[in-house]
UniProtKB/Swiss-Prot annotation:
Biological processes, Gene Ontology terms: cap-dependent translational initiation; formation of cytoplasmic translation initiation complex; translational initiation
Gene Ontology CC, one term: eukaryotic 43S preinitiation complex
Molecular function terms, GO-annotated: mRNA cap binding; translation initiation factor activity
Subunit structure, as described in the record: Component of the eukaryotic translation initiation factor 3 (eIF-3) complex.
Name recorded for this polypeptide: Eukaryotic translation initiation factor 3 subunit D
RNA gate, as annotated region: 294-308
Keyword Phosphoprotein among UniProt keywords: no
Location(s), subcellular: Cytoplasm
Pfam families listed in its UniProt record: eIF-3_zeta (PF05091)
UniProt function note: mRNA cap-binding component of the eukaryotic translation initiation factor 3 (eIF-3) complex, which is involved in protein synthesis of a specialized repertoire of mRNAs and, together with other initiation factors, stimulates binding of mRNA and methionyl-tRNAi to the 40S ribosome. The eIF-3 complex specifically targets and initiates translation of a subset of mRNAs involved in cell proliferation. In the eIF-3 complex, eif3d specifically recognizes and binds the 7-methylguanosine cap of a subset of mRNAs.
InterPro entries, per database record: eIF3d
Length: 563
């Protein structure tokens, strides 16, 4: 019995609080665990398999399902901000004669199974390089996905202002209060509809317009026409300063301009911040713009998701591009007209003074009235830019607008190469980048009753110079047909407008502010004091009164001296 082996019972670890051992041996302490799959193939020590297996079916043969997604033990070097510098990584456009040159070098060299070909040695290496380049591109995409999702950055940063910080058009003050039902999000507004809105009644027509020169319809990229600056006066008068609207107060209870109404109708497409002042006087509503606002400036690239435009972009900042686009639009709308051929309406332009009578821009104002139901009578001042002869010799009213090219490297489409042969692609790109602006123009034309909407394509002569431009072509649309092409639903537009009017009509007399949030798809309606935005005007009035009083005192003193 003494020579037999003795059985020693092993130590059993009982973990009453969970599953697994209670303690970790010192030999295995602090060893990280790498997740893996037993289905992975062995042979991953060096990842050279991408260039060996040129057939795409075997490109991911040894790729682990845990390999790319798990970055637990990856090494990340701390960023040294002192050595940070900006690098231009934008792709330069190749000249036409250098494009697709690799395609001809590979002819007969690389096939799927790498067999045959006159230049097989050279072409085979090219195929391996292409596969390696494909793997690098795939890895870059994976790293980008990890940064966007794993680093806390949302995929929709670009849509929510990730490219540059947008600011509100007006600073919200503490005493301003949002109405109880005054926060309207875009998804809810996009579901509203007001169908079967009757045709409007034209109450008043005034002004004079010139005829459109059809020679500009034949302009192409091969016979460009320089854009010439036109010295003409454009009146952008707000609603409450319009003398004609004051005469029509008895015929309606909601008053606005076409620019304000189209902004509200197409608000679900806007990304930039804007604001509109609403005044409730008795039973009437007046929609106004602020005097010191940028409401009348045209936006550029407002709805683009892939354009890196910010206030540090040199000449291509949002403010500079907006001023440039407005300058181009005004000059183009007057340059394409025939001098001397004028159509005068029944009443003169109400905003013209004796000083600028000879330099006023070609414009016709039509005051139109819509019945929106439930006692809502809307009167809008609409505008036409020109007049032209239709295909049957009839007289047609026209609205003239301009799209401008400022940098083809940013937009991805070179107008000088694509405008004549692929005009649809150019317009599609502009619709993607400037959807809100095009929708506003279309809504303006429909409100005014224009038969045609003329679009001009204007580009910089030198993309580093914002002072010289050239006309590359024009395009003509029927407003309602164009609204269908750009998916502008006028029933929804009327529904959005009616919803905002109803909310404002429920409020007592006073002043409201409609503000588009700069970073969210939301508009808010604030209740603001009646004296808001009027301090400067009151100060000016007080100064004028003081000057008049001083003059009166001086005259009195002079009279006393004579006595």
């Amino acid at each position: 019995m003494a020579g037999k082996a003795k059985f020693c019972a092993p130590e059993i670890q009982d973990n009453p609080d969970g599953w697994g051992p209670c303690s970790v041996p010192t030999a295995f302490k602090d060893i990280p665990y790498q997740p893996f799959s037993k289905a992975d193939r062995l042979g991953k020590v060096s990842d050279w398999t991408g260039s060996v297996y040129q057939d795409r079916r075997y490109a991911n043969k040894y790729q682990s399902q845990f390999g790319t997604g798990n970055q637990m033990f990856s090494y990340y070097h701390e960023e040294d901000e002192t050595s940070f510098q900006l690098v231009d990584t934008s792709r330069t456009q190749r000249p036409g004669y250098m494009r697709n040159r690799n395609r001809f070098n590979q002819r007969g060299g690389y096939r799927r199974d790498n067999r045959g070909g006159r230049f097989q040695g050279q072409g085979g290496n090219m195929g391996m390089q292409n596969l390696s380049r494909g793997r690098d591109t795939r890895n870059k995409f994976q790293r980008k996905m990890q940064r966007n999702w794993g680093g806390g950055r949302h995929w929709s940063d670009k849509k929510t202002g990730g490219m540059h910080k947008r600011v509100a058009s007006v600073t919200v003050r503490e005493e301003w209060k949002v109405l109880e039902d005054g926060e309207l999000d875009f998804p809810r507004l996009s579901k509203l509809n007001l169908p079967n809105v009757e045709e409007p009644e034209t109450l008043y027509e005034c002004g004079s317009v010139e005829y459109y020169d059809k020679a500009y319809d034949r302009v192409t990229t091969k016979n460009e026409v320089p854009l010439v600056g036109v010295n003409r006066v454009f009146h952008k008068v707000t609603t409450t300063d319009d003398p004609i609207i004051s005469k029509l107060l008895s015929q309606g209870n909601v008053f606005a301009t076409d620019a304000i109404i189209s902004t509200l109708m197409t608000c679900t497409r806007s990304n930039y911040s804007w604001d509109i002042v609403v005044q409730r006087v008795g039973s009437k509503l007046f929609f106004d713009k602020r005097d010191d606002s940028e409401f009348d400036l045209l936006t550029v690239g407002e709805t683009a998701n892939d354009l890196n435009i910010d206030e540090t972009s040199g000449i291509n900042t949002p403010t500079n591009l907006s001023l440039e686009a407005t300058f181009i639009n005004q000059n183009f709308s007057q340059q394409v007209l025939k001098r001397g051929e004028v159509k005068t309406f029944d009443h003169p332009n109400p905003f013209v003074t004796d000083e600028d009578d000879s330099t006023v821009a070609s414009v016709c104002y039509r005051y139109r009235k819509w019945d929106l139901g439930d006692g809502i009578q809307l009167i809008v001042r609409c505008e036409h830019d020109a007049i032209m002869q239709g295909p049957r010799g009839e007289t047609c009213l026209v609205n003239i607008k301009t799209l401008n090219e400022w940098d083809p490297k940013m937009t991805g489409v070179d107008w000088r190469q694509k405008l004549d042969s692929q005009r649809g692609a150019v317009l599609a790109t502009e619709l993607k980048n400037n959807s809100c602006k095009l929708a506003k123009w279309t809504a303006n034309s429909i409100l005014a009753g224009s038969e045609y909407l003329k679009l001009g394509y204007v580009s910089r002569v030198n993309f580093l110079d914002t002072s010289k431009h050239t006309i590359l072509g024009t395009q003509q649309f029927r407003p309602r047909e164009f609204a269908t092409q750009i998916a502008l639903n006028m029933d929804n537009a009327w529904g959005v407008l009616r919803c905002i009017i109803d909310i404002c009509m429920k409020q007592p007399e006073g002043k409201l502010l409609i503000l588009k949030d700069p970073s969210k798809g939301v508009i808010r309606i604030y209740d603001i004091p009646n004296s808001t935005f009027e301090t400067d005007e009151e100060d000016d009035d007080d100064d004028e009164d003081d000057v008049e009083n001083d003059d009166g005192d001086d005259e009195k003193d002079e009279g006393d001296g004579e006595d």
